[in-house]
Swiss-Prot record:
Keyword Ion transport: yes
Principal location class: membrane
Location within or outside the cell: Cell inner membrane
Keyword Repeat found: no
Family designation: Belongs to the ATPase B chain family.
PANTHER family to which the protein is assigned, alphabetical: ATP SYNTHASE SUBUNIT B (PTHR33445:SF1), ATP SYNTHASE SUBUNIT B', CHLOROPLASTIC (PTHR33445)
Membrane topology: Single-pass membrane protein
GO molecular function: proton-transporting ATP synthase activity, rotational mechanism; proton-transporting ATPase activity, rotational mechanism
Identification of the protein by name: ATP synthase subunit b 1
C-alpha cells in the first residue's frame, strides 16, 4: 500500500488534528455549557415575562375593579345629590305654600277686621244719627223733664249695647 502525500491526505490530517484539538480544548463541553446557559437565560426571561404578564393582568383587574367601584360611588353620589335636590325643592315649595297661606290668612284677618271696624263705624254713625233724630223729635214734642229722662235712658241703653 502506498501512501500518497497529496493535498487530500494533508486535508484529512488537518481535519483530524483540528477535531482532536477541538476535543482536547473541550470545545463541545463549552459549547454545550454555553448553549445550556443560553437556554437557562431564555427560560428565565420567559419566566420573568410570564410573571410580568400575570402581574400586569392582576393590576388590570385591580384597576378595573377600582374603576367599577368609583363608578358605583359616583352613581351613589349623583343619586344622593338628586334626592337632596328633590328634598330641597319640596321643602322650598312647602315653605312657599306656607308663606302664601300665612299671607292669605293675614290678609283675610285684616279684611275681617276692616269689615268689623266699618260695621262698628256705621253702627256708631247710625246710633249718633238716631240719637240726634230722637233729640230733635223729643225737643219738639216733649218738655225738658221728659227729654232729660228719655235722653238718659237712651244713652244708658246705647252704652250697654255697644259695650
Amino acid at each position: 500500500m502506498e501512501f500518497h502525500l497529496d493535498a487530500t491526505f494533508f486535508a484529512f490530517v488537518g481535519l483530524v488534528l483540528f477535531l482532536a484539538l477541538v476535543v482536547y480544548l473541550k470545545v463541545p463541553g463549552m459549547m454545550a455549557r454555553s448553549l445550556d446557559d443560553r437556554a437557562d437565560q431564555i427560560r428565565n426571561e420567559l419566566a420573568e415575562a410570564k410573571r410580568l404578564r400575570e402581574e400586569a393582568q392582576h393590576l388590570l383587574a385591580e384597576y378595573q375593579r377600582k374603576r367599577k367601584e368609583a363608578e358605583a360611588e359616583a352613581a351613589h353620589i349623583v343619586a344622593a345629590a338628586e334626592r337632596e335636590a328633590e328634598m330641597l325643592t319640596a321643602d322650598a315649595k312647602k315653605k312657599t305654600e306656607e308663606f302664601v297661606a300665612n299671607r292669605t290668612a293675614l290678609s283675610e284677618q285684616k279684611i275681617l277686621q276692616a269689615e268689623a271696624e266699618a260695621m262698628k263705624a256705621v253702627r256708631s254713625a247710625a246710633v249718633d244719627l238716631a240719637i240726634a233724630a230722637a233729640e230733635t223729635v223729643l225737643a219738639k214734642q216733649a218738655d225738658a223733664k221728659v227729654q232729660s229722662e228719655l235722653f238718659g235712658n237712651a244713652v244708658s241703653q246705647v252704652k250697654t249695647r255697644l259695650n
